[in-house]
Curated annotation (Swiss-Prot):
Endonuclease that is involved in the suppression of homologous recombination and thus may have a key role in the control of bacterial genetic diversity. Acts as a ribosome collision sensor, splitting the ribosome into its 2 subunits. Detects stalled/collided 70S ribosomes which it binds and splits by an ATP-hydrolysis driven conformational change. Acts upstream of the ribosome quality control system (RQC), a ribosome-associated complex that mediates the extraction of incompletely synthesized nascent chains from stalled ribosomes and their subsequent degradation. Probably generates substrates for RQC. Gene3D superfamilies: 1.10.1420.10, 3.30.1370.110, P-loop containing nucleotide triphosphate hydrolases. This is Endonuclease MutS2. GO terms for molecular function: ATP binding; ATP hydrolysis activity; ATP-dependent DNA damage sensor activity; endonuclease activity; mismatched DNA binding; ribosomal large subunit binding; rRNA binding. The keyword Endoplasmic reticulum does not apply. PROSITE patterns: DNA_MISMATCH_REPAIR_2, SMR. Residues 743-818 form the Smr domain. Keywords: ATP-binding, DNA-binding, Endonuclease, Hydrolase, Nuclease, Nucleotide-binding, RNA-binding, rRNA-binding. It is an enzyme of class 3 (hydrolase). Pfam families: MSSS (PF20297), MutS_V (PF00488), Smr (PF01713). The lineage of its organism: Bacteria, Pseudomonadati, Spirochaetota, Spirochaetia, Spirochaetales.
């Protein structure tokens, strides 16, 4: 990455923003020096740290990083014999040791949980050297405010100093209280000169008090006298202070020599906490600004390293995808854009009006690549996927060089020449207004030749232009894609949205009109443009309208599909509940029959015993016959009661199935008017292609449609729209009819996880389970976000939370239903 590219894209401002989230001065300095990397392993490790820190941050379990003054400057020369740190230096070392101690305290609960041990931040903190001994050593010398402890060897000297000071104060008070001397003094308080206590005496009393004169006032009216009886005491005080300083120096030297033994650990810990502070800053920025860590795409394999989101809606593998990307320096005014290139595409040509957002889109793409390769998150949607480039270069804006006397065009060509020289198949090249600044025909020819060369090198190229020929170039090359910035024809202003696959217009005349150019000039301009240009303009407008219609149709189709799925799910759930009711009824019936037979068995045993023990009489014979008749009647009653309950269940099941069953098509034949259910469009059968497939004319299109997606129109004379019909599709591949108390999503794709969550919710409701767990892991957070979004939308969820560290931590979510 060249300094020119970093400067043009204002990467230094990104560093400043993230550095502002740092806690330590060393962390800020580290952030401000960070540059994009090309070592994929290092970038992935950095991103993994950020992802895991963000996960802990969202779970309110982030490691503590405390402010502390820089330590490294104090370590210079520390290992020299006799070296002594001052109190400030000792305090800085102590605060570092205290920071490490706090991190290791935070680490303790994580070490007891194997799942949390996989978190890269936990592993990172584990590697920071233990500094408990150093912490205890330093804080036995000073307290946590940086003040000296009450050390025994210093305490004796301080007591001696205090005793001498008390003696001096007592002697001095005599001068201020004695009537004979008090009138000689200029002040009733002693003062200090050169570290010795003196009294201020009026000059006219000179010689009246024996002692040493230290100084005269400027006016000469006062002199400062050290009384004779104080001289020796002052000497003793100065000597005591010197003794104190010598002892303090000895203690500091001894402490410093012990600290020096930990120099390597101090440096290692300092480096680790500095890096952790930078990682934490990027994660806090991500948390505050809805940023994500972009998924990774390996250009060598042309697929996503993490698999998720590596294909577009049509299943085409992607090589570059910005999803709802917002330029980080535009704040809330940034309009989210989507940019994508499939694995076979290499050049994106963006056209459209000035001030429409073309250049901002280019800068966003390039800046995101730089941020991503620094290991930092980007302000975008969760589907964002970026490859790793070994060279990122741009030619943007007015590159005119005044000091080299180069024109705008010359400056551009000089820059482009250097870019072409260095470009390769893992390069990202940004070219703004390629071929401008000179004759349009020649500029356009140069632009196409440059793109030919970059295409041959298989470089990724994002280019903006006003040249109409470059739009045609985009359609004539297989690896090129046209795009445009949207323009609102009603307001005559840009919307700043990117339309993929559609070329744009400059709209110069429309913009001129909006900015007040007189109407007669506007009309004249249209005349000069000519009809051919107007026809092309209308064609492009038509394409844009078709593009919008298609997007609207796709959105409508998705909404209908979601409604179908929800209706189908509700119906399946209802049927499942009925089946559960049927099962409960059968269990209840079996229980009732068991009780019934047990009661009759006991009665029969008693009857047999009576017959054995007594003589057979007519009364006993009649009694047995009566019992048998009663038994048969009771048995018939039980059977009828169960049969009636079963009939009710069967009727409800049948009603549910009939309500949701799609009517069978009558005999299909050529010319029959039909409704395509999945498209909600009318059509006419042309012919049967093969068994179960028909060729259908829909508007101006001919489509091959599956027979089960076709419904015959009731009125064959007039086509009409029909609402889609919900049908129940039984899932024979369902793994279980019972919910799991611990649903594992690890290794699933997004669609599989979504279905597993829905099945779990349905089964939990049917079986009356009020709490279960979801194991989604940490990773890039995709499965975690998907699970939490699902739970937020579900009306059956009472609450959900991350598991406690001892339960599994942030890789697991506990769900309560209510």
């Amino acid at each position: 990455m060249t300094e020119h590219t970093l400067e043009v894209l204002q990467f230094s401002r990104i560093r400043e923003i993230i550095a502002s989230y740092c806690v330590t001065d060393e962390g800020k300095e580290f952030c401000l020096k960070k540059n994009p990397d090309t070592d994929i392993k290092k970038i992935e490790e950095e991103k993994k740290l950020g992802i895991d820190f963000l996960s802990l941050l969202r779970a309110y379990k982030a490691p503590p990083i405390k402010y502390r003054p820089p330590v490294l400057p104090f370590l210079e020369g520390i290992e020299v014999e006799g070296a002594a740190l001052d109190i400030e230096g000792v305090y800085s070392v102590g605060l570092l040791a205290l920071s490490v101690f706090s991190l290791h305290e935070w680490l303790s609960p994580f070490l007891e949980n194997e799942d949390l041990n996989e978190n890269s931040i936990v592993s990172f903190v584990k590697k920071i050297p233990d500094m408990l001994h150093l912490k205890n050593l330093v804080f036995s010398f000073i307290d946590e405010n940086g003040e000296l402890q009450d050390l025994p060897s210093l305490r004796a000297i301080k007591n001696k100093i205090r005793s001498i000071e008390d003696d001096i104060d007592k002697t001095m008070r005599n001068y201020f209280t004695n009537d004979a001397t008090r009138q000689m003094l200029q002040s009733n308080l002693p003062t200090v000169k050169d570290g010795r206590q003196v009294i201020a005496v009026r000059s006219n009393f000179k010689g009246r008090i024996p002692g040493i004169i230290h100084e005269y006032s400027q006016s000469g009216q006062t002199f400062y006298l050290e009384p004779e009886e104080i001289v020796l005491k002052n000497n003793d005080l100065i000597a005591a202070h010197a003794e104190y300083e010598r002892e303090l120096l000895r203690l500091l030297q001894d402490l410093t020599s012990q600290i020096a033994e930990h120099t390597e650990n101090i440096k290692e810990a300092c480096e680790a906490i500095t890096k952790l502070d930078c990682v934490a800053a990027a994660s806090r920025w991500a948390h505050s600004n809805n940023c994500v860590f972009a998924g990774s795409i390996d250009l060598g394999l042309s697929h996503s390293i993490d698999k998720d989101g590596s294909h577009d809606s049509k299943g085409t593998p992607l090589a570059f995808y910005l999803h709802q990307a917002r330029h980080p320096l535009l704040g809330k005014s940034a309009v989210p854009i989507d940019l994508k290139l499939s694995k076979d595409d290499r050049v994106l040509i963006i056209t459209g009006p000035n001030t429409g957002g073309k250049t901002v889109s280019l800068k966003t793409a390039a800046l995101f690549a730089l941020i991503n390769q620094t290991g930092w998150p980007v302000p975008a949607g969760p589907l964002t996927r970026l490859p790793y480039f070994d060279f990122i270069a741009c030619d943007i804006g007015d590159e005119q060089s005044m000091d080299q006397s180069l024109s705008t065009f010359s400056a551009h060509m000089k820059n482009v020449s250097e870019i072409i020289r260095r470009a390769g198949d893992k390069s990202l090249i940004i070219l703004d207004e390629l071929g401008s600044g000179t004759d349009p025909q020649e500029g356009c020819a140069i632009a196409m030749a440059v793109l030919d060369d970059l295409l041959e090198k298989k470089a990724f190229v994002f280019v903006t232009t006003h040249h109409g020929a470059l739009k045609n170039y985009g359609y004539s090359k297989e690896s090129c894609v046209n795009a445009s910035v949207e323009f609102n024809q009603n307001t005559l202003s840009p919307t700043y949205r990117i339309l993929m696959g559609v070329p744009g217009e400059s709209h110069a005349v429309d913009i001129a009109k909006r900015n007040g150019l007189p109407e007669h000039i506007i009309e004249k301009a249209h005349t000069y443009l000519g009809n051919n240009r107007a026809d092309v303009s209308d064609l492009i407008k038509g394409l844009i309208q078709k593009h919008e219609d298609l997007n609207e149709f796709e959105l409508q189709k998705k909404e209908e599909e979601l409604k179908l799925k929800e209706d189908r799910r509700r119906s399946d759930l209802k049927e499942l509940q009925l089946k559960q009711k049927e099962l409960e009824l059968k269990k209840d019936g079996i229980k009732r029959l068991d009780l019934f037979f047990e009661e009759k068995r006991k009665f029969l045993e008693n009857l047999v015993r009576e017959l054995r023990e007594g003589e057979l009489s007519r009364e006993k014979t009649l009694s047995v016959k009566k019992w048998i008749d009663d038994f048969e009647k009771d048995l018939d009653k039980e059977h009828e009661a169960l049969k009636l309950e079963q009939t009710k269940i069967d009727e409800r099941l049948h009603s549910s199935k009939e309500k949701n069953k799609a009517p069978q098509n009558p005999e299909l034949r050529e010319g029959t008017r039909v409704i395509i259910k999945s498209l909600n469009r009318n059509g006419e059968l042309i012919r049967e292609e093969k068994k179960g497939k028909w060729l259908v004319a829909v508007d101006n299109l001919k489509l091959t449609i599956a027979e089960d997606d076709i419904e015959v129109c009731e009125n064959q004379e007039k086509l009409k729209l029909s609402k889609p019909i919900v049908s129940i599709i039984s899932d024979t591949s369902a793994p279980s009819s019972r919910p799991s108390f611990e649903l594992r999503l690890l290794g699933m794709r997004a669609e599989e996880a979504q279905k597993a969550l829905q099945d779990q919710m349905d089964l939990a409701l049917v079986h009356g389970i009020t709490e279960f767990a979801i194991i989604h892991g940490k990773g890039h957070g995709i499965l975690q976000e998907l699970s939490h979004d699902f739970l937020k939308r579900s009306p059956y969820v009472k609450a959900f939370r991350f598991a406690k560290p001892e339960e599994g931590g942030s890789g697991k979510t506990i769900v309560s239903l209510g």
